[in-house]
Amino acid sequence: TADEITAKLGQGIGVAGSGISGCGPSIGLAANITDRASIRVMLDQVALAYGGFDSIAVTAGIFVPSDTTGHIPDDKWALTFGINVTGSYLVADEAFKTWKEQGLRGNLVLTTSANAVVAKKGSVAYDCSKAAANHLVRELSIELSPLVRVNGVAPATVVQGSAMFPRDRVIGSLAKYSIPYTDDEATESLVKKLAQFYADRTLTKSPITPADQAEAYFLLVTNRLSKTTGQVITVDGGLHEAFLR
């Protein structure tokens, strides 16, 4: 979390009269990704604290499962697309204003998912939103060129270290896939079981971690892949169902 990062790295000095408490190696700010004005305020605060910004990685996302009948309420469908698709667009649109003012090249990385190309039961809103996010990467790479490179990172299911997998969801998934567990089993143990189950479906048999994703983001926002734009890099351990046809 932002608090954990700033606690580890420190906030440094503040910006006098700005209301910003720190502008050292890290700064924690809140924003509603579905609200353009909220995004604008956050970006302005970042620009004030650091003199501008070079790269943005959008990791905000939400998964809303269907109910037992396979139905998802209209408001939950809209919320899923609002965060997973429209939110990324709003960030890109507002950030581009600053990038143009700076006159310097920038990088934008969106988070999509292996689910974007794998149709399956029980996650229709999420899967469709991530398919839209994949194409948003391509569209934005054209709209924001040549000043900004736009790419995506598409991980497979990340259980370890993910806020999207609280204990109750982990238990629900273990039961769904008939994976043995006990009610008094430690959450860490349950998470490892589920993570390995997903990993065993891949070619590398290795669970996907947040650190694995971070490597892909790092490559995309640095000059190591400076000629790459409009692409989605998969970090899925080799999920053959997601191979593009």
Where are these regions (language model features)?
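The beta1-alpha1 cofactor-binding region of Rossmann-like NAD(H)/NADP(H)-dependent oxidoreductases
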Residues: A30-V41, D74, A211-D212
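Short C-terminal tail/terminal secondary-structure segment
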Residues: F63-S66, Y217-F218, T229-R245
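Substrate-binding pocket helix/loop in short-chain dehydrogenase/reductase
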Residues: D67-T69, P73-L79, Y198
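Active-site loop-to-helix junction immediately N-terminal to the catalytic Tyr of the SDR YXXXK motif
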Residues: I72, A119-D127, E139
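Active-site helix of classical SDR
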Residues: A92, S129, V137
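Residue(s) in the substrate-gating loop at a strand-loop-helix junction
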Residues: S113
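Short, small/polar-rich loop/turn modules that mediate ligand/substrate recognition or access, typified
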Residues: S145-R149, T228-G230
